[in-house]
Amino acid sequence: MANERHYSATDRLLLQADAALRTLLPFSGKPYRPSPAQGEPETQLDAGKARHVAGLMRINHTGEVCAQALYQGQALTARLPRVRGAMEQAANEEIDHLAWCEQRIRELNSRPSLLNPLFYGLSFGIGATAGLISDRISLGFVAATEDQVCKHLDDHLKQLPEEDRKSRAILEQMRIDEQQHATTALEAGGLRFPAPVKFGMTLLSKVMTKSTYRI
């Protein structure tokens, strides 16, 4: 495109730093879409249920932190402009999920995970490395990551108390969006990862979910 803006390496690094701050600082990410929980009734959960739901939403929030970092790392090193643009668009859409989860966590009188900076750094490194290897690998990581997220969401939807319609509305919309991201990445040429690679990613995701449920 004739009017496409071209950024220098310094510009891109500054943009990545800004994205990191907006991801990690409380309430700094502004959603593009209103929360699906708007209009749903607030149900008083007992203390045990509220703690459990807060733990689940904390896991999902950290998952979105990881997704942001993964996409930003890939956007930094992607070779083709269309792939870079796809990564940046996916990151923008994940901002909605990040903000929705954080808002719900606060409504449950809890807080995001203290481990978010660590997981952001690790995910950014993975994304940047994938982008350096090839755009097909980079897009494949998106698809495989979103598949993992969908599995987490399916499990969490089963665990939610039936009366918690706010959290359910958020997770159901996230599930739709994440599946679309995975499909788009594969259609754009993403590599379908073999089972051993997906198994390794599953193990890593379990480390994240177990640790962020409480911390």
From Swiss-Prot:
<keyword id="KW-0503">Monooxygenase</keyword>
<keyword id="KW-0472">Membrane</keyword>
<feature type="binding site">
    <location>
        <position position="181"/>
    </location>
    <ligand>
        <name>Fe cation 2</name>
    </ligand>
</feature>
<comment type="function">
    <text>Catalyzes the hydroxylation of 2-nonaprenyl-3-methyl-6-methoxy-1,4-benzoquinol during ubiquinone biosynthesis.</text>
</comment>
<dbReference type="GO" id="GO:0046872">
    <property type="term" value="F:metal ion binding"/>
</dbReference>
<protein>
    <recommendedName>
        <fullName>3-demethoxyubiquinol 3-hydroxylase</fullName>
        <ecNumber>1.14.99.60</ecNumber>
    </recommendedName>
</protein>
<keyword id="KW-1003">Cell membrane</keyword>
<dbReference type="GO" id="GO:0005886">
    <property type="term" value="C:plasma membrane"/>
</dbReference>
<dbReference type="InterPro" id="IPR047809">
    <property type="entry name" value="COQ7_proteobact"/>
</dbReference>
<feature type="binding site">
    <location>
        <position position="94"/>
    </location>
    <ligand>
        <name>Fe cation 2</name>
    </ligand>
</feature>
<dbReference type="GO" id="GO:0006744">
    <property type="term" value="P:ubiquinone biosynthetic process"/>
</dbReference>
<feature type="binding site">
    <location>
        <position position="64"/>
    </location>
    <ligand>
        <name>Fe cation 1</name>
    </ligand>
</feature>
<dbReference type="InterPro" id="IPR009078">
    <property type="entry name" value="Ferritin-like_SF"/>
</dbReference>
<feature type="binding site">
    <location>
        <position position="146"/>
    </location>
    <ligand>
        <name>Fe cation 2</name>
    </ligand>
</feature>
<dbReference type="Pfam" id="PF03232">
    <property type="entry name" value="COQ7"/>
</dbReference>
<feature type="binding site">
    <location>
        <position position="97"/>
    </location>
    <ligand>
        <name>Fe cation 1</name>
    </ligand>
</feature>
<feature type="binding site">
    <location>
        <position position="178"/>
    </location>
    <ligand>
        <name>Fe cation 2</name>
    </ligand>
</feature>
<comment type="pathway">
    <text>Cofactor biosynthesis; ubiquinone biosynthesis.</text>
</comment>
<keyword id="KW-0831">Ubiquinone biosynthesis</keyword>
<keyword id="KW-0408">Iron</keyword>
<comment type="similarity">
    <text>Belongs to the COQ7 family.</text>
</comment>
<dbReference type="GO" id="GO:0008682">
    <property type="term" value="F:3-demethoxyubiquinol 3-hydroxylase activity"/>
</dbReference>
<dbReference type="InterPro" id="IPR011566">
    <property type="entry name" value="Ubq_synth_Coq7"/>
</dbReference>
<dbReference type="InterPro" id="IPR012347">
    <property type="entry name" value="Ferritin-like"/>
</dbReference>
<keyword id="KW-0560">Oxidoreductase</keyword>
<keyword id="KW-0479">Metal-binding</keyword>
<feature type="binding site">
    <location>
        <position position="178"/>
    </location>
    <ligand>
        <name>Fe cation 1</name>
    </ligand>
</feature>
<feature type="binding site">
    <location>
        <position position="94"/>
    </location>
    <ligand>
        <name>Fe cation 1</name>
    </ligand>
</feature>
